[in-house]
Amino acid sequence: FENHRRRTYVGLSLMAAQAFFYNAIFFTYALILIDFYDVASDRVGLYLLPFAIGNFLGPVLIGRMFDTHGRRIMIAFTYIASGLLLALTGWLFVRNLIDATTQTACWTIIFFFASCAASSAYLTVSETFPLEIRAMAIAFFYAVGTGIGGVLAPSLFGLLIDTGSRVSVFWGYLFGSALMIFAGCVAWIWGINAERKSLEDVARPLTFVGTE
């Protein structure tokens, strides 16, 4: 990673942000619905379907744009859009302007973009490092992302939800939003235009690569 510092920063930013963002919402949405919207626990599962639809349609409808419009611009767009939409949803939530149905609709729209953002993070770390360390890079960034998203995010949001305060949850949303926007900016500044290029052109083998 010494010879690819900027790519390492991009990979860490993208993986950590999407992991926190995804897990913070996905693994606490049931608590939000039950604690703040009085949704019966046996009906919470019904609200999962829109999540699945948003997650599916995002990559299907705009995934190809990562090749036609460019990796860097689309990664930045999906990350920043996801962050801004979460901030807006958080504001509507804290102002009590949405109910369980519209809250779920907002999450569905957010994950339409966030699913592409998350996919692009894995794509980025898999194609921007030399072949010799590609598997190691994927494992490393996945471990970091899982540590942040799989442990920190649900724990933090669980504590915020337990306060019973919409304001506390809103601050959690803003933090997740800030992470996504920051990662999007990092990708815009330091991202690689890898579209329609061979992997060897994107990241030359270690026997040929010099310091960037």
Model regions and ranges:
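C-terminal ends and interior cores of transmembrane alpha-helices
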Residues: 81-97
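Helix-to-loop junctions at the C-terminal end of transmembrane segments
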Residues: 59-70, 161
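Cytoplasmic membrane-interface "Motif A"-like loop-to-helix N-cap segments
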Residues: 68-79
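Hydrophobic core of transmembrane alpha-helices in multi-pass small-molecule transporters
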Residues: 100-116
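Intracellular juxtamembrane helix-capping segments at the cytosolic ends
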Residues: 116-129
